[in-house]
Amino acid sequence: MINFYIDIVTTGANIKHLRQNAGLSVKQLTEMIGISSIQAVYRWERGEALPSIDNLMILSTIFNTPLDEIIVRRSFNDTL
């Protein structure tokens, strides 16, 4: 059986890094995504929550980056 999970802390760090490299503020990114809550982006970046798949696709487009370079996947075996 294959058991994977998304490392939300590292994924959040990737989102923050990509945003900063793009020269975008959190407010600007929020507006580009089309969401009303700035706190949502802060929560993603702190690793407290994951964006929806729709928002991940939008982030991938905004940053011109494949999803697998935004999302960090780990195997449960990595933590044993």
Predicted regions span which residues?
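Short, basic-rich loop-to-helix N-cap that marks the start of a DNA-contacting helix
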Residues: 47-58, 77-79
